[in-house]
């Protein structure tokens, strides 16, 4: 099928695999993989896509593919990835695949120079091209820009962000120290904010929005970094294969001995905050030798160093110190940072044990004394005060509204541990804030015209165990995905509709309900969490129960027991919840949600740290203390500062900033879970492409216009360079002249109501027009002026040609007048002399008759001399009369009188001669009369037969018209009956459509949930549960399930029959009911297949027409979307009709204009005809007759794929006036076009299906 062309079909690990269609099922296609001949599998028809003809070809912009679908998108990315081409476009969106190794020269300074000022598409896809586009858009549009770098953890967001910043500073910096500072700030931020996770060795555990500010000359003048949601829980605990923040390990590995002794550092395994995770350093062979043995943990000694081409703890420590120096940190401030980091490590080593006294509480273990001493020393605290603050909590009693006694409440071991960890998180969090503020101080700016912001924030995260950090990160990604949907999909389509471009609508998943679930006031999860924090005794269990109670029937929220992973099903309902995010379902364990949502310390700990002897420590907490003065509660109580709502506020401010700027998108893709090079896991990459919206963008860009400019903006940009005569032009007319002057192809752009739009891949042309360089604008104005001059000169030429044509027309008319005068004069002359001329003609005719006299005389036997004398005298009289007419003016009456006398003489003479031969002539005359009578009799019989046939045809046509009118009346009667119940039916259908739409959304979401669960299971070496595995089987839509249910009540269940089996049964079966059922199922599958072909046709090609549009104009969507129309029960009348009507033969003819000729010939001179012979409800023979083309003959069986697949009722032919013709009219055309020979050859090759036509031909041949 499909002429052996390959298609892409789903594959569980590769995403898609190439194969051939070998059979058509009820709702699926049977595929034979190209690399596994003989093996087949089923694939849902809407998950099969046509493949490119050259499977090894790759394109830089996926919009250039012949077939635009998710399979070709994935394959193109894969082919380019195998060639180390990690960047690909989808229109103006960049897809970046993480290579996990250094590609030579791809980010060199020469490469940077090669992209400067180049339009998107003129150079190979690159992150530099997006950065340059953002800069040029900022410069031309006078509008700040944003670059949103998104993707999963480990997809390469941080690296691509650094490349964008480096490109902007190197290309458009002022050459001063500030350019280097902006670039050098990254190593410092990464050291304090990045860490190794199971999915990424250099994962950013915070979000940042880096703004590069430019002056009016578009030169870099400074920058600013905003940061969001540092993962504070990582400071105290990490996973087994994960590490704490890089700074801890780099300080242990790279610090000098002097610093090491001052900070009392040792190997990572000696610190509680490091030894519960991975304690190995990142190092290569050279730096491994430079790390002293006493700094290596036993795990490092046993397993060796961690390997990553971008990470090296010892070398990165040196680079970090260099970066600190470049951004202006002196040695003292550098040591302050290290001192706080070391203080946090020693704080974590403080252990507690239960006190032996009856008062309860706890004490420090003896072995923790050194750690307490080191921590107090490094943080500038008193040892005793630190001990007391960690083991007790101060409470202040109240009496009658006045302050009472200060009471110290001893803490239990668990409470002390929590207090210690809270202090460590707070200290490190404030240190990180200080680092970011210090970075911002190193590149200040006084004034800024515009900025380019680069957003790098943690990607969508899904682990086996997910907590509050993952919840906030995924909430952020939901908001960013919504911004992407709004900017790229929603706003684009609204603009296309507003401008009247006629672009087809693209549907996408709206995640607003998920965002509302999290952030809506009062009942949102964040507000419920804040409310829980305000309770006297908050608990995670109570919070979780309230969430489930408030959102009991919410589609996006469910209980852990419904997870696809077995490990989550062990959770109780009050221990977690599942949120169905845009990328898939994630199970959150709510333990510590309440604690992590509070960013405040107990008053005793906060007072302790704020009163530190160390001025650097005090400075870290001063700003926080000032901000929270008004929010402090009574001593001893834990004041509440909501982390969730603080992040929500920051996020909304960020999105407001993004919405106020132009946006460019970089979608980073993680090629595999093992983080190895040249390994492409298609299924999980496909999931990333789908979740990032690339498939929807691809659908939109089939007819989209990613670049646009307002007529007035263009006009105003060029106005000051225009001469006065051009300035008078209308803006729209000027734009048209500009495009004509540049020689742009009209296919590449389209004019809207107020803007001009450019197709994907035409960014170079757009940039050429929008380039605001004065010399360039002046040059374009000259070209417009030149084009206008040339255009007007052509108009002058045309006018000259028109004048010449008018002159020739005048000359032609003068000659015509002369000809008319000549003709009139001739006519007047003829009218004057016509009697004499007519007389001469008649007399001349009479003279010619004398030859007949001579013939008669020659046959006479007697009296010849006398007769000859009489004839001679008659001839003399005739000559005399002719001479008289010529010489004298005689009237018509005179001529007639003398002519009559001569005629009488000649008749008398002739009658005398004829009497002698009367007998012979009489016999001859009788014979001729007899022949004439016989001929007349035959002619009358033929006329009678013709009239009889015409009468019969008129009678048949009247019967056909009467039948058509009767059918029309019956149809109208049925419609009237339907209208009476239309309100109920429409309401029911609306409910069904809504339910089915929701069901489709649920199925799509469950599919994403399964894919995400599978990826977690692969990563965590955990199998998906049996129920989840069962769900991975081929899923059927509700309509297909209804079809199967209906099949159980029918006599013949054909749902499992193959396409070939249906065809063979139709050709051989004698069971009328089975034959009717097979015909119906056969044509239903043809409808589904042709609908699939129409949806997946080649780009910029017309849909293949098997019949005129008026016949095939039915809705394709129900067949692709598994709508209830697929239910065979709904088609039962057609089957019953075939059984009841005993295969009535009907013939039709309607006009047929091919799509390619539709607009080329307005007068329909190339109109063809479409003939159809229906054997019962199904078509048996089909003809197409087109001018200048050989006729196309098709017969059922042999040509099913090219014939009309609709039944007679669905075509509407019976309701078309004048469409039905007589069998004789069809058969005449069929025979004349060679149909008999074509049908005979099909019968002999056993390809023709048994029909009325085949039976008649076989009888004729016998």
UniProtKB/Swiss-Prot annotation:
Residue span, IQ domain:
814-834
Residue ranges, annotated region (SAH): 917-984
Question: Which positions fall inside the Myosin motor domain?
Answer: 57-771
Q: Per the record, which residues fall in region Required for binding calmodulin?
A: 782-810
Query: Which CDD domains does this entry report, sorted A to Z?
Result: CBD_MYO6-like, MYO6_MIU_linker, MYSc_Myo6, MyUb_Myo6
Which residue ranges does the record annotate as region Interaction with TAX1BP1 and CALCOCO2/NDP52? 1034-1253
Q: Where in the cell is it found?
A: Golgi apparatus, trans-Golgi network membrane; Golgi apparatus; Nucleus; Cytoplasm, Perinuclear region
Highest taxon in the source lineage:
Eukaryota
The modified positions for Phosphothreonine read 405
According to the record, the residues making up region (Interaction with OPTN) are: 1084-1086
Q: Where is this region: Responsible for slow ATPase activity?
A: 273-317
Q: Where are the transmembrane segments?
A: none
On whether ATP-binding is a keyword of this UniProt record, the answer is yes
Q: How does it sit in the membrane?
A: Peripheral membrane protein
Q: What happens when the gene is disrupted?
A: Mice display hearing loss, hyperactivity and circling behavior, suggesting vestibular defects. Higher steady state levels of LC3-II, indicating defciciency in autophagy.
> Could you say which tissues express the protein in this record?
Within the cochlea, expressed specifically within the sensory hair cells (at protein level). Expressed in the inner and outer plexiform layer of the retina (at protein level). Widely expressed. Expressed in the brain, kidney, liver, and testis.
**First-listed, main subcellular location of the protein, grouped into a coarse class:** Golgi
SMART domains under this entry?
Answer: MYSc
Domain topic, free-text comment: Divided into three regions: a N-terminal motor (head) domain, followed by a neck domain consisting of a calmodulin-binding linker domain and a single IQ motif, and a C-terminal tail region with a three-helix bundle region, a SAH domain and a unique globular domain required for interaction with other proteins such as cargo-binding. The SAH (single alpha-helix) region is characterized by a high content of charged residues which are predicted to stabilize the alpha-helical structure by ionic bonds. Its contribution to the mechanism conferring the myosin movement on actin filaments is debated.
Report the protein's function.
Myosins are actin-based motor molecules with ATPase activity. Unconventional myosins serve in intracellular movements. Myosin 6 is a reverse-direction motor protein that moves towards the minus-end of actin filaments. Has slow rate of actin-activated ADP release due to weak ATP binding. Functions in a variety of intracellular processes such as vesicular membrane trafficking and cell migration. Required for the structural integrity of the Golgi apparatus via the p53-dependent pro-survival pathway.
* Subunit description: Homodimer; dimerization seems to implicate the unfolding of the three-helix bundle region creating an additional calmodulin binding site, and cargo binding. Able to function as a monomer under specific conditions in vitro. Forms a complex with CFTR and DAB2 in the apical membrane of epithelial cells. Component of the DISP/DOCK7-induced septin displacement complex, at least composed of DOCK7, LRCH3 and MYO6.
Task: Give the protein's recorded name.
Answer: Unconventional myosin-VI
